[in-house]
Amino acid sequence: MPCPRFSRRGLLAASLIAGLEHAGFGQTPADTARYETPYKYGRLVLEASKEPEAFDSRTVDCPFVFHHDGRFYMTYVSWDGTGYQTGLASSNNLVDWKKEGCILRRDPSSPVTRYNIAMNWIVRANEMRSAGELKKVRGRFLGVYHAYPNAGLEEGPAVIGLCWSSDLMHWEIADPCLRPEDGAAWENGGLYKPCLVEHRGTYHLFYNAKTKGARWREQTGVASSNDLKSWKRYEGNPTIPNGPAGSWDERFASDPCVLVDGSRWVFFYYSLDTAGKARDLLAVGTDPFHPAKAARILVDVGPPGSVDSTYAHKPSVVYHEGALYHFYCAVSGKWPKEVRGISVARSRPW
C-alpha cells in the first residue's frame, strides 16, 4: 500500500492537517434551493464487510444509484488493500440495502484491469425529478469505468473506458476511450470518476482529472461523442475548474454527477479546500459546457462523532416519492483508520 501522502486519500488527510482558512464563493444561480438536501439520515446505509477475503473488506465508496425492474440499485467501489473492484446492492426504500455481490472484478490477464476496475455510472434517465431508470443502448446497458495501472491505492495514472451488460451482473469490458497522456496538462496526471449522459443522440462523458505532482489539483471536464468510438474533448476544459485561493474547491473540483432539470444542466460535484474539508457542491448551466458554481454547500461535513465528520463527498442523486435523495461517501476518523461508507441526505425530513 502506498504512503498516504502520495495517495488521493492521503492528500485529503494532509490538507486537513494544514487547517487553512477559506474564502467565500461566487454568485448563486437563481432557484438552486430545489437541489438542496439538508436532512441527513445520519447513519451509513452501506459499509465495508470487514471480511478478510472479501472484495469489499476495507471500504465502500463512490455510490451510483439508479432504478431498474421496480427496485433501486447502487453500484459502489470497494477496496480490499490491493485495488478497486465494483459491487452492486439493491433496495426497495433507498435506506435498507442488500449487497448482491461483486459485478466487476480485477482481471490478472488484462493490462488495464489487472489491479483495479471501478465502474461509476450506467446510462440512465437524465431527468432530475426521476428515479434514474436505466436506458438501454443498442440493446444493452452501457457503463463507464476507470482503472489504475498498479496495485495499491490509486497508484498510477488511471484511464477511462466503456463496459456493456445484458443483466447488470456480467460485463464486457472495452478498451480505454480516454487516456491522460492524450489530454491537456490539467489531466496528464490521471483520470478519475466518469459520468456518461446521453442527450439528443450525443454522449457527454464528464470526468475529473489531476495534474502531475505530489500535491496535484483535480478539476472536471467533458468529452463528447456521437458514436461511442471517437471522443472529442471540449476545447474549453476544464468546465469546472478550481476556485481561487481560499475557495471551497481550491484543490479539488471532482466526481461529477450531471443531470438535466428542464432547460438546466445541474452539476453535483465534490470539493476539497486547503483546510482539508471535502464536501458536495453545485453548479448549474444551460448546456453541458458552461456550468456556473453556486455559492452554497449542498452536503457538508458533520460534527465530531458523526459518520461524515471527516468528509461528505462524491454525490449520486435520485428522486423518489416527492423527495430528492443525495447519496454520498461518508468518512469518519483519520487515515489509515478511517471508516468509509455510504450515507444519504434528502430534501424533506426523515
What are the residue ranges of the model-derived segments?
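Helix-centric, low-specificity signal for extended rod-like, repetitive segments
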Residues: M1-P2, V307
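N-terminal secretory signal peptides and thylakoid transit peptides that target proteins
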Residues: P2-I17
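Conserved active-site neighborhood of enzyme catalytic/cofactor-binding cores
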Residues: S316
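Beta-rich carbohydrate-recognition and catalytic domains
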Residues: Q27-M119, V123-G189, V197-R251, L259-T310, ...
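Bacterial Sec-dependent signal peptides at the C-terminal "C-region" and cleavage site
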Residues: A18-A30
